[in-house]
Amino acid sequence: MQNYVDAKFRILQNQTKDDAFIFWNDDPIIAREIAKRHPEATLYPFAETHENGVKGYTENNQVVIETANGTFTMEQDLLALTGTHNLYNSLASGIASKIVDIHDEKIRASLSDFTGVEHRLEKVLRVRGVDYINDSKATNVNSCWYALQSMT
């Protein structure tokens, strides 16, 4: 497992103080590795709830992104994609967008009308009130769990 973690964290080797490292703050493995590696990049953690130092989070049904370029907010219910994993993806992409100073209106529009990608919780059709969804990318237990969780 550590070899896999080391491979994923190689990205930090070439990052400088001028770069951004956006990461999920709630994962204890990520937290441990960041503490161990002392990255030079500016850290942009995100989490489901507001904690000290977190740059992307939800609070009172609002998605909140805080960077040096300002604060972005939008109603969580307006996110186009459902599920916790898609919330995390929205927080990460929102942070990246604010870092490069994309206008709030464009971020809001993107997060509220993004249709997803093929084979990932792709809505195929509805027949007699039953939704048929193509999630053929969910090839492991974790992917299936997040997909099913997003439907409740």
Residue ranges: model-predicted function:
Residues 1-132:
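Acidic, Mg2+-coordinating active-site environments of NTP-dependent enzymes
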Residues 136-152:
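AMP-binding/adenylate-forming catalytic core of the ANL superfamily
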